[in-house]
From Swiss-Prot:
Catalytic activities: UDP-N-acetyl-alpha-D-muramate + L-alanine + ATP = UDP-N-acetyl-alpha-D-muramoyl-L-alanine + ADP + phosphate + H(+)
HAMAP family xref list: MurC
Domain of life: Bacteria
Residues bound to ATP: 122-128
Pfam families reported in the protein's UniProt record: Mur_ligase, Mur_ligase_C, Mur_ligase_M
Entry keyword annotation includes Cytoplasm: yes
The enzyme's E.C. designation: 6.3.2.8
Pathway where this protein functions: Cell wall biogenesis; peptidoglycan biosynthesis
Protein name: UDP-N-acetylmuramate--L-alanine ligase
PANTHER family xref list: UDP-N-ACETYLMURAMATE--L-ALANINE LIGASE, UDP-N-ACETYLMURAMATE--L-ALANINE LIGASE-RELATED
Primary location class: cytoplasm
Family the entry assigns: Belongs to the MurCDEF family.
Its biological purpose: Cell wall formation.
Length: 477
């Protein structure tokens, strides 16, 4: 049936039904929630059930477990995650029925079409920076729409449809899909060698993609670039758009001075253009989070948020799910306890930043790390860097690599990584086959007063939650 667009331009009534294949993915749930709030009939499928899919169901989405051709019948558009294979039965059925298929980033670009877009790109720190920008703009009364890759703890969600004109999103460089976006403001936090498999194992192609990302800005657009990152600093010199820099670097336009850490809090002086200076308290540990806060401050200043309001937003920001989440003290037996921190970090540079934050906040505690490597290709490409940073902790437990759909690569598994760490002569890592075994193994490694970091982008976060709710397992299982 051929449908006519309504004279009043109400496209929602003309094409109301949107189906998401892989709806439980971090990049998909936020778009689905915004479209639900806009009035679309949203359905979706995923092989796994999680907090995000259950939330969407309570909001009115129809969520199916597993993939079936029948799931797309009657839908007007199919949105697909980059993790979905071309032979997925729902995609095949959509093609046979001539239903439009849109990649996730293309649908995000459609949402941006009707608002002023702020896109946050970078290998690390995107989620935290995007969340901080949303918090600053919200505190400033701009009521932005935001779509974030992690759960904003204050909102209990990773997306919100605001009444204001600004849309704040993460721009995913991992597969080059950020080049579909046409923002008004582009933030680049850092550029690192990750997801090389999508760039022909050529780091220069990643850097070229970021250059092209900035070229997608209109001539009146703005690039906000972190001067502390050498690759981004180089990009700043080549950008053919209006540029504003931020960083702890003394030459940055928006910068932090007198940076001090006390436990999980950072204190610094925020120096804005035109001589504006305010003291800031940030409830996120680590210098990397100071940089994230500076990016949000720069955006807020550009959009007219008063400096004192920026400071208030940063102080009240409570964080994002799985970004240095302090889960409190957990018992390890005999009346002893350890402090448990859950974190999404899965790249050597992220591990290094989190370790520095942990040592800066708790210098007297022994640092024990349970790490689940993510992807065999990343473990292979960053093998030496992983071995170097992981050998710096006081005690280490490695689980097997979370494959994320990849097949094993010889020499890029947990045992090989443990051998490389052991060869450095600084630590004796323990290797477990399944991540769930951490519940049984960790009590034998931990000591009273330790700081335990559980890190990785796979399913190790669910194990941290099990430990909080059910405790460790002692003795025979």
């Amino acid at each position: 049936m051929i449908r006519r667009l309504q004279d009043n331009g109400d496209l929602i009534r003309a094409f109301p039904r949107v189906h998401f294949v892989g709806i439980g993915g971090a990049g998909m749930t936020g778009i689905a929630e915004v479209m639900l709030t806009l009035g679309y009939e949203v359905s979706g499928s995923d092989n796994a059930d999680n907090v995000a899919t259950r939330r969407l169901a309570t909001l009115g989405a129809r969520v199916m477990r597993g993939h079936s051709a029948a799931n797309v019948l009657g839908t007007d558009c199919v949105v697909v995650s980059s993790a979905i294979r071309e032979d997925n039965p729902e995609l095949m059925e959509a093609r046979s029925q001539r239903i439009p298929i849109m990649p996730r980033a293309a649908m995000l670009a459609e949402l941006m079409r009707f608002r002023h877009g702020i896109a946050v790109a970078g290998t690390h720190g995107k989620t935290t920076t995007t969340s901080l920008i949303a918090a600053v703009l919200s505190e400033g009364g701009l009521d932005p729409t935001f779509v974030i890759g992690g759960q904003l703890l204050a909102a209990g969600a990773n997306a919100k449809l605001g009444a204001g004109q600004w849309l704040v999103v993460e721009a995913d460089e991992s597969d080059g899909s950020f080049l579909r976006l046409n923002p008004l403001v582009a933030v680049v936090t850092n550029i690192d060698a990750d997801h090389l498999e999508n760039y022909g194992n050529d780091f220069s192609r990643i850097k070229d993609a970021f250059t092209e990302f900035l070229q997608r800005l209109p001539f009146y657009g703005l690039a906000l670039l972190c001067l502390d990152d050498p690759e981004v600093a180089e990009l700043a010199g080549k950008a053919r758009r209006h540029v504003m820099t931020y960083g702890i670097d003394a030459a940055a336009d928006v910068r932090a001075e007198d940076v001090v850490q006390d436990g999980a809090r950072m204190y610094f002086t925020l120096c804005l253009p035109e001589g504006k200076v305010i003291p800031v308290t940030l409830a996120l540990p680590g210098r990397h989070n100071v940089l994230n806060a500076l990016a949000a401050s720069a955006v807020g200043w550009q959009l007219g948020v008063p400096p004192e309001v920026i400071g208030r937003a940063l102080k009240s920001f409570v964080g994002i799910g799985r970004r240095f989440n302090d889960l409190g003290d957990v018992a390890i037996g005999n009346g002893a306890c350890v402090r448990l921190i859950d974190d999404y970090g899965h790249h050597p540079r992220e591990l290094e930043a989190v370790f520095a934050a942990a040592r800066g906040g708790w210098p007297d505690k022994r640092l024990v790390v349970a790490f689940q490597p993510h992807r065999y290709s990343r473990t292979r490409d960053q093998f030496d860097a992983f071995a170097a940073v992981l050998s710096s902790v006081d005690a280490l437990v490695l689980s097997e690599v979370y494959p994320a759909g990849e097949v094993p690569i010889p020499g890029a598994d947990a045992k090989a990584l443990a051998r490389a760490i052991r060869a450095r002569g600084r630590s004796e890592p323990v290797v477990v086959g399944q991540v769930a075994s951490l519940i049984e193994v960790l009590p034998d490694v931990l000591q009273e007063g330790d700081l335990l970091l559980m890190m990785g982008a796979g399913d190790i976060g669910s194990i941290a939650q099990r430990i909080v709710h059910d405790g460790f397992v002692f003795g025979e299982v």
